[in-house]
Amino acid sequence: MTTNLFNIFDPSTTIFNLEMNWISTLLIILFMPNFLWILPNRMNWLLFKMFNMLNNEMLMLYKMKKTKSPAFLFISLFMFILLNNFFSLFPYIFSSSSHMVFSVTLAIPFWMFFIILSTCKNTKNMIAHLIPLNTPIYLAPLMTIIETMSIIIRPMSLSIRLTANLIAGHLLMTLLNFNSLMIIIIFIQMFMMIFELCVALIQSYVFSILSSLYSSE
């Protein structure tokens, strides 16, 4: 019997006394589609459809040509998070995306990159963005502080949203882990598995879309 529900997030996998837990994040390399086939298979077709959908949505955010849009960067981010979320649902695979260090490691570099880029390339618009349009002059200092704080906490809000939703789903599946062959129990567990797959997809989409939205501002 599990005495601590959070034990599911800290398995220990060692080879030659080396911690191998985070190697699971590299499993996505084995599942990326190859282009050696004359006719695309179903996996390629599904991924291309997903790429086109995300690319069209992000192009509307940036309002620029495909050749100049950084949409491919966020599509890669989406696929990386999505596959890690899916792998974390399999037994005996380390749930890397349920750890705060995983989401923070992705959110902060993206945030810093676009903050530095916008500051260097478009300094005036970056500073003007700190004060919303039609703000009274006496509220300008306060609004500047509020907007600055909202920009600073963006990577943490992205990280917490992703981690908290995945942790909640894993804990709920652990609580409903009954060793029973009753039909109702099996249907409940199947429903929870489908629900977790949907959560993994939605959270990956939200993380990548919000990252692109923050960068477009």
Curated annotation (Swiss-Prot):
Enzymatic reactions: H(+)(in) = H(+)(out)
Alphabetical list of SUPFAM superfamilies matching this protein: F1F0 ATP synthase subunit A (SSF81336)
Q: How is the protein disposed in the membrane? A: Multi-pass membrane protein
Sorted alphabetically, which keywords does the UniProt record give?
ATP synthesis, CF(0), Hydrogen ion transport, Ion transport, Membrane, Mitochondrion, Mitochondrion inner membrane, Transmembrane, Transmembrane helix, Transport
UniProt main location, coarse: mitochondrion
Q: Extract the Pfam families matched here.
A: ATP-synt_A
Which spans are transmembrane here? 20-40, 70-90, 100-120, 126-146, 166-188, 193-215
What domain of life is recorded for the organism?
Answer: Eukaryota
UniProt GO cellular component terms? mitochondrial inner membrane; proton-transporting ATP synthase complex
Q: Subcellular localization, per the record? A: Mitochondrion inner membrane
Keyword Transmembrane helix listed? The answer is yes
Q: Which residues form a coiled coil?
A: none
GO MF, one term, reads: proton-transporting ATP synthase activity, rotational mechanism
- InterPro entries per the record? ATP_synth_F0_asu, ATP_synth_F0_asu_AS, ATP_synth_F0_asu_bact/mt, F0_ATP_A_sf
* Keyword Cytoplasm on entry: no
* PROSITE patterns the UniProt entry points to: ATPASE_A (PS00449)
Which BP terms does GO give this entry? proton motive force-driven ATP synthesis; proton transmembrane transport
Tell me the protein family, please: Belongs to the ATPase A chain family.
Q: What does this protein do?
A: Subunit a, of the mitochondrial membrane ATP synthase complex (F(1)F(0) ATP synthase or Complex V) that produces ATP from ADP in the presence of a proton gradient across the membrane which is generated by electron transport complexes of the respiratory chain. ATP synthase complex consist of a soluble F(1) head domain - the catalytic core - and a membrane F(1) domain - the membrane proton channel. These two domains are linked by a central stalk rotating inside the F(1) region and a stationary peripheral stalk.
> Subunit arrangement?
Component of the ATP synthase complex composed at least of ATP5F1A/subunit alpha, ATP5F1B/subunit beta, ATP5MC1/subunit c (homooctomer), MT-ATP6/subunit a, MT-ATP8/subunit 8, ATP5ME/subunit e, ATP5MF/subunit f, ATP5MG/subunit g, ATP5MK/subunit k, ATP5MJ/subunit j, ATP5F1C/subunit gamma, ATP5F1D/subunit delta, ATP5F1E/subunit epsilon, ATP5PF/subunit F6, ATP5PB/subunit b, ATP5PD/subunit d, ATP5PO/subunit OSCP.
Protein name, per record? ATP synthase F(0) complex subunit a
Which taxonomic lineage does the organism of this UniProt entry have?
A: Eukaryota, Metazoa, Ecdysozoa, Arthropoda, Hexapoda
